[in-house]
């Protein structure tokens, strides 16, 4: 008959207590490995100067957020000014319209059946009072129309801000693409350069002007083969890298 096996004082138990210790050890190794990889990546980026690209891209994000908040505030204020002007001008216009329609109906009735002199006098007095008040009403309406027009000044200000945000988005894209291009394998870089050159030649032949290629982000100095010249090339680069 087999004797039961008992764990000695120095032996590790066969139960479930050994699994958490092994799992903790594996987790520690994974964390240590991730830390080493992070440090290696950080040191490599610093040596290559790529940390500055990422730093500039990261610094642009809060600025872009603040500018977008400014655009939202300006458009909200302009919308409120327009709505307030409409709320002021609309009753004035409605009052003028109602009084004009009432006077027209009274004059039409008098022409259909002439009335006594006293009633004609009253109708004429009401008409003159309406005509005297009409310039004030139109001036008030014109003032609100001017306010609506002035409220559109946000378009120029926000347009400048939006252009700045677009420039910052371009900067972020440029810096991140620089990091990607400078760290891909040489054969990948040559393959992308050939694709970029083919796209550039195709676009030049289609537009007849190589200047149209300057609209996209450029991630390398002029004259190098790994220059990204339009958004199609950016998409092609990211696709070739598996993104």
Curated annotation (Swiss-Prot):
Subcellular locations according to the entry: Cytoplasm
Region (Disordered): 1-23, 203-227
Chief location category: cytoplasm
EC number of this enzyme: 3.1.3.-
InterPro entries (UniProt xref): Chemotax_Pase_CheZ, CheZ_family_phosphatases
Molecular function via GO: phosphoprotein phosphatase activity
Source organism, top-level taxon: Bacteria
Coiled coil start-end: none
Gene Ontology biological process terms in this record: archaeal or bacterial-type flagellum-dependent cell motility; chemotaxis; regulation of chemotaxis
A Pfam short name: CheZ
Keywords tagged on the record: Chemotaxis, Cytoplasm, Flagellar rotation, Hydrolase, Protein phosphatase
SUPFAM superfamilies membership: Chemotaxis phosphatase CheZ
Self-association and partners: Homodimer.
Family to which the UniProt record says this protein belongs: Belongs to the CheZ family.
Name of this chain's protein: Protein phosphatase CheZ
Organism: Burkholderia multivorans (strain ATCC 17616 / 249)
Gene (UniProt): cheZ
